[in-house]
């Protein structure tokens, strides 16, 4: 079957931002103006198409990444709407991995906010080209120039305006396109009708200055056009667009546009910018893959290449069961065919292929390189697994996710709920890699862990609504960690003789701190003192032992272990014996390696009216917080601080109380830090 759209006409992009910047509203307008929906859904009344979970409709926030596709100007746009709340950054992370471009949405009143910084960092990690859309230009306090400054100062982003707003706040009624030097004046109707007119006389000088600045910045990306410009020749519209596009593709230059999605102003111009400047799958560099022998290969977005796809999200559909969202990087995948899950080494059947419009399904026969769709029928595939053909096994780079920082105990209310709860928790942890569940060996309680209080609140809510499981919930607990602060050499020797074959494992391991680098294992065995087949079990033995540290039973992190000596027995040595010997060495080292307890520290940003500034500062200090900075935004004060997660429990209630409901805050995990001794005693 031939392609409906040439691969160069594809745009795989995400919409990302801080909570409440207007991502979902912008997505809804994109669906409406591209003809995908015939009625605009609103977030505030629970009618948004992209927010389809009950919890999303109630809370007016986006929890999962809804995927949809639209057509605009002969291009097919795969659009992913991602959450802005810090507890759901995993959704942003896995979406960015499979997208080619992104639109970063800013609130015109607030500019760059904490979660903007987080998602921007994530996008930079994957070198995702971006356009910035300054939304809510009609809002009181909207300030386009402040947004530009905050992009350059807080994100160190090379951001340049390619549009200018005409008016602001209640008087926002148009946009100046600096590429074409035309003004779009809106008549206020719902369908974003606008007239193309001359630039208002009182803005002509500013527009010319901003255009000059834009051209000076963008000609750097094309030598030929730069020469033309330096020789005093006038640049055409196509010349400027070509330079902007080249700049965007470097993922180091970010054009800035503006509008107000709720009032339907600027969305069509944003769609034009997506088509004009964001990359197609063939514009981005080939991705790295690995053959079954471990050798590296570059995978190009080509239909006639070998099949290479990545599962980036699992969702449960009430009608068809498990949906596996995939991005195809190379080759063609047909419904009814078999694929190899290269990560797990198993064969799976593709029963059906569906393109998603929010939570509605559209059946398709095949999916080609560069496209995104959902697969029905993959029973064992999970997030991060690589899919390829059986004939040519290919592995893509795995996806890494943050460890949970908060836990709580849940118990079923009735015997009937017990079995249902186990199945439900298994499904939920399959969908969300940052959600973990396990049984505490000592108390026999079921523990659930996640990225924040809201994350776990949503999980418990889903247990009740989707899976009809009633549970009692314990108080939240912080997920502490343990680590070494000094070097230590230790020996682990495990010998067991009890008739017949014995057990023998003997190791010498040097342990040392490995700040913020996780667990690192180094094999320095020479001369065959320990046979090669026992090296992996030694590493596995250490990893198992580190799951429950010697100090308080919390997982150990940031430790480097160097295996440098040992011995073996021809008959009695076994994998199990070396696993035990490794754990004995770790236990021995903990006596002299300065074992300490670490607690999670959160980066907190509190916004309060000026009259509550002193109260807010005092409250943060009382929570063992350290003030990092403050700034004034309009008539509010913004306080930036680092506060231990343990001290943040109940903060929302307290803040609401002393600010009469006028204060708000956001927080994100920052790092682990040595906990005070008083905490250890507790």
UniProtKB/Swiss-Prot annotation:
The keyword Nucleotide-binding applies. GO terms for cellular component: cytoplasm. GTP binds at residues 17-24, 81-85, 135-138. It is found in: Cytoplasm. Its main location: cytoplasm. Residues 8-282 form the tr-type G domain. Signal peptide: none annotated. Gene3D superfamilies: 3.30.230.10, 3.30.70.240, Elongation Factor G (Translational Gtpase), domain 3 (3.30.70.870), P-loop containing nucleotide triphosphate hydrolases (3.40.50.300), Translation factors (2.40.30.10). One of its GO terms (biological process) is ribosome disassembly. Pfam families: EFG_C, EFG_III, EFG_IV, GTP_EFTU, GTP_EFTU_D2. NCBIfam families: EF-G, PRK12740.1-5, small_GTP. This is Elongation factor G. It comes from Malacoplasma penetrans (strain HF-2).
